[in-house]
């Protein structure tokens, strides 16, 4: 025995003897337990010496654990002792057996997780596109449709928010460039974003080529060539090459490199789409910390910063920008806290948890005598124990010193002890805490829903009386009793009368007995013990007590004792006929808000006719009975107009509410379903049923807080009484939130049914349900009934009228048969005259039919609808439209069917060219069995060619296929590989086509001509040009050749652009089979270089015909008016008599410059030495310059370092304008978004060019942002803000905005993009307009002012030079500039001047100092009196 006792050495034995057998018990482990354990081990055939080590104990635990479930009490005790010993060996402190067992459980769970993790790591992820086959070769498996579909969904749902980048990164794990291109192509519809991405890829590819020059000489045999930039982008490399690079030794990870480039581009796109700075992310006062952290990291991912900077942001900004409550907690945690610790510490601060805690505290006060801790969740808290024997707190009956009470401690009866007592416990305190009204709850699963407190009511009724209508009122007395209705938003407390005494009690359907506190009742009582939440309480039982509850009387047993709250249990509630009722669908409401800063609609009700008022009154009375709408009082200030229309083919009326105003003010919703399901994507099913949900919207409750905004009024005839006011309790028809909320609720409701029946396919679109399965029809129908039951439980009816059990099924406008589908029969109307509305409907029907009838065309029918016509206008059919309609009628006569999708077979798409820019296509798996067909007739640009259109068709089909089937079909295209290659090499960045093969179905797609890339030796060179006069619309076009030929033709009703094209046409007509053409028109060059083969312009079509006939054509561009030989000659030829010539030398140059820059008369007079009258005549003759100049008044600070900034809007874009106040010089730029980031960047650029001391802006959010403040601080710029709502404080920049817009208007047609026009206008304003002080242009003036400022700063040193400066100044209240005066002295804040022998001191901000160059001022000695005359 001694040997066995030596299991533990001295120190460990002490620890062993401190451990308690039970939590809170007195007994502890002793030496005897070790001796007993070693003996027991021998009984179980285990070696007792195992007890001496940690490892040994672990082995014993492993052996015993498996037998625990079936083992005896001794075995369990042995196991417990060994577990405690295991921890003593490891010198880990445990206080009692339970803690040791808990620790072991935790340890085992952790090791199990690690095992699972290891196992998971061993399995290869399916997303790695390059895998090794059995032969050991590296092969490529294409990205799965699921991956592509996930990517498309990400872009559709998130647009380009920051999450897109990690999602892209995860989905493209290990992908090859070809896979990455597939991913990009599936979202090719986002053209602006893709263009940005393309630019980034091209830049990166060029940079790669620069850093990795090609090695000279041939590549040694067996060695791979090195990838170029375009190889990495997957455009000039094959899939095999990509795999070889990626798996070679050493590898070139082309996939990863390309992915990095794409992520760079995505970063740019994200910055454009969600320009939020991390500095702007602050936690709201009531925002849960977890939500704030999510927003913070979402923005952090989009920030352009190194990882170190991001780490710093996380450490400092996260805490700094949290709200005060969380900040206090986080600071207490100290700087080293992990994110997990922060989240745990701040859990529930400010969120709904606050309310829960307050409720819990209130509850604990009410039930402080009756708390029982659950298991050991609250370690360390002492529970209050109460003695059953004497009733005192602080000890239990076993340790009670008072004499033992006779009988049972539970029921008080003699003859048995408590452990043998059979008396039932009274579950008296089973009150569910309902959340406060309007608090968002988690959507519980349907099992828990059955007893959730969401929207139930307690009704009290007697006997089997039918329930009267909700809300009915008591009328009269006696038997016409109406029963109260009690909602469960608050605890159902009611006033009761017991034996004549008034009390308040809780109606508790979960308690068996009725228990009251502190009430004296007559008659005999029996002692009784009942079990409550906090243990047992002693009560007195009174029988046959009359109780009155809510006017209903009952007689029953009442228990009286120390209950924390008076309870009416089921023994009385059942007598009263009290029921739990679920009214309108128990679906939880979706919280809805108005747009920030907006209030509800207040639109007056318009007058209605008597019959409409009657109809509406009837409809609303019915709806009110059904609980769909409720009457409201005058306290609701909102209103939406309501009217009535007759239902189609019936005498019944229908109520319509005009929710347009409310829709404008309601928050935006995410469109839950992006399109409608298509039958071609359905898999073939044995049994099918189609259901329709009745009164769909009216089954879903509307958010309680939002209901007030749906108020409407039914007026009375002749206003004899005030209108009746109602508001909606359910989703209204016509409100913009209804579809999204309905679909969201429907999806949640179907979720448990779908999970329970995975073999059943349910397609849900709004209220149409398609249910398919491979079950036998009997079983299938049973499932359908289960589904209908399930929907009914949630308040959705599925009317038998619209329940389709037998094929053909009519669903979503389609007709479904067991093995094929078609569109529902289409009738094309026969009419002698067609209105716009008729043709719109006809085109709609044909469009719908085109998904299954191949060859339908509608181009000429659509042409009839061009221009703004009224719906009722009669439109004559053109001959082409008649023919098109007749062809379509023939096609539709023969019914055509589509088949269903078979996932085991490949998809094939075949495309045909129909001519006239129309294309048709079929998608099938077996020949002649089409899944679906379609047509394409979009023209994305005015001048296009077939190859470009073909790629557009392919991309449309690819996107459509991913949506319907989740994968891309193989394409069969009517184009030869060579033709495609030729075109594609030029345009690879813009397009990508998936796997395809050539199919010879005429007409084939071909490139009709090709332009040479180098001049053609020996061919004649034609210099072409054209000119037109804007007013007379007369023009000339012509050419001059290097062989001395020339030709000019006069044109009428033309424009500059047309004459340029006409000149090219002339050159092509008059030249041989090979020709070089030189033009100075970017416009003409741009059109022809894209190799169009058709155009909306007749002239371009004629040029195309000429180009097709030539063998070789080279087209090149030179800048105009730069004295280039042939170009200058032809320019003179076509200009004579067209561009206006006045009667003086130098005028033509001035006029030409004016046509380009619209400079003012002063600039022309000075630059071309023209008399003012002639210069003014040029301006007067320009139709774009006949706008009045605007005078500037008001007193503005004119110090040299001050700039005013403002944003203005034009063509839907934002222009940021900066004006140098003293000179009127402008800097302006089109910015992508009105954000602090863009503004700060602009300010830094400005500060890098000019000395900026002060910027003066309005209070726009971009100017007041922290980013701008930081930029100003860094550049040492002082920021001043204007007076809110007083545009005058921004006067200079405001008037410059107008001026700039005026100039842009004059030259807008010279530039394609607004950003170009803005820079042209800035140039014109700064250098081509003269006037104002000194007769300078703004550009000359700013340089003069800055130079002068530098010189005058040296004034004190060189006081003698001061006489050379002149000062223009303003007096205090007079806005007119005076001067010039002599400068005597310049200080920091003021200048001293001499004006007509009078010496004055003028504040620095009211003076402009200019060097006197002895130049003649425009005007006499005072310029300022004249405003600019431009």
From Swiss-Prot:
Transmembrane segments: none
First and last residues of each zinc finger (CCHC-type): 385-402, 406-423
Catalytic residues, chain numbering: 508
Domain RNase H type-1: 1016-1139
Motif (Nuclear export signal) on chain: 16-22
Residue span of region Interaction with membrane phosphatidylinositol 4,5-bisphosphate: 73-77
SMART domains (alphabetical): ZnF_C2HC
Region of interest: Dimerization/Multimerization of capsid protein p24: 273-359
Residue numbers bearing the Phosphotyrosine modification: 128
Lipid attachment residues per UniProt (N-myristoyl glycine): 2
InterPro entries: Aspartic_peptidase_AS (IPR001969), DNA/RNA_pol_sf (IPR043502), Gag_p24_C (IPR045345), Integrase-like_N (IPR017856), Integrase_C_dom_sf_retrovir (IPR036862), Integrase_C_retrovir (IPR001037), Integrase_cat-core (IPR001584), Integrase_Zn-bd_dom_N (IPR003308)
EC number: 3.4.23.16, 2.7.7.49, 2.7.7.7, 3.1.26.13
Location of the DNA-binding region in this protein: 1365-1412
Domain Reverse transcriptase: 626-816
Region annotation Interaction with human PPIA/CYPA and NUP153: where it falls in the sequence: 185-223
Cofactor: Mg(2+)
Name this polypeptide is given: Gag-Pol polyprotein
Organism for this UniProt entry: Human immunodeficiency virus type 1 group M subtype F2 (isolate MP255)
Protein's gene: gag-pol
